[in-house]
From Swiss-Prot:
Catalytic activity entry: carboxy-S-adenosyl-L-methionine + 5-hydroxyuridine(34) in tRNA = 5-carboxymethoxyuridine(34) in tRNA + S-adenosyl-L-homocysteine + H(+)
Gene3D superfamilies listed in its UniProt record: Vaccinia Virus protein VP39
One Pfam family per UniProt: Methyltransf_9
GO MF terms held by the record: methyltransferase activity; transferase activity, transferring alkyl or aryl (other than methyl) groups
Superkingdom of origin: Bacteria
Ligand binding (carboxy-S-adenosyl-L-methionine): K91, W105, K110, G130, D152, P153, T154, I181, E182, M196, Y200, R315
Record protein name field: tRNA U34 carboxymethyltransferase
Disulfide bonds: none
Amino acid sequence: MIEFGNFYQLIAKNHLSHWLETLPAQIAAWQREQQHGLFKQWSNAVEFLPEITPWRLDLLHSVTAESETPLSEGQLKRIDTLLRNLMPWRKGPFSLYGVDIDTEWRSDWKWDRVLPHLSDLTGRTILDVGCGSGYHLWRMIGAGAHLAVGIDPTQLFLCQFEAVRKLLGNDQRAHLLPLGIEQLPALKAFDTVFSMGVLYHRRSPLEHLWQLKDQLVNEGELVLETLVVDGDENTVLVPGDRYAQMRNVYFIPSAPALKKWLEKCGFIDVRIADVCVTTTEEQRRTEWMVTESLADFLNPNDRSKTVEGYPAPQRAVLIARKP
């Protein structure tokens, strides 16, 4: 059973304590009403994992845990089997006592692109919206964050996060809540808010930007990473039924248009930090994610186009500040 009591106790003692006015009731409702049909199977996989305290833990350069003496073949097989019960693994990679989870996305590459542009994370309280399995939460802790909170309603991601946490010695510096941002009150409590790979899934992208702003303290920093297209500040792609085989893609602006959106929502010091094309080396099928991936979503005769004929995915990182 995945519990959230440790998080409640933690925030009761800090500037997030006002969140306790709504959060426990929301989580209780989720536990009663909204659990996925496979959730018990997934949570059992987490429960059956061994409790291990790492001898060496690296969250600065990767997410890697090692034991002082190698685990037995039986222990490794048990961990490997239980983690494979939580497939597909999309965001990573993780290296846990000799079990290497080669995820669909090289999320470490994204982190390497983003990190040089951030304000120092040391001592910060961070919110990561749409955090997936929580890979970047651990990297935020490795970069010095005091507390990293992720929200993502996908319940498999919650179980993946809790599995990794257990194998990292039940580390309580990062937490994942099975919520969407629309369920959060205007906390105005986070020093840095990340939204990476979310905006294009929102029917109302400007509303999403306002929601992100409502989570930041004054002078707080927003890190926004999303799909973009080439063009000027008036360029926005509105795909038809699908984009790269995804149904739930609504608006893909140019980076200059996105900068304008952020300014319209009241952010200041907005800058385009990075723009890069997503490659089939960064997003691909692996033995931990065996279904279709980026290579299957591109036109086989013209890799600069999706199968629908749109520009192939490229992603931008924008940094902005709440006044």
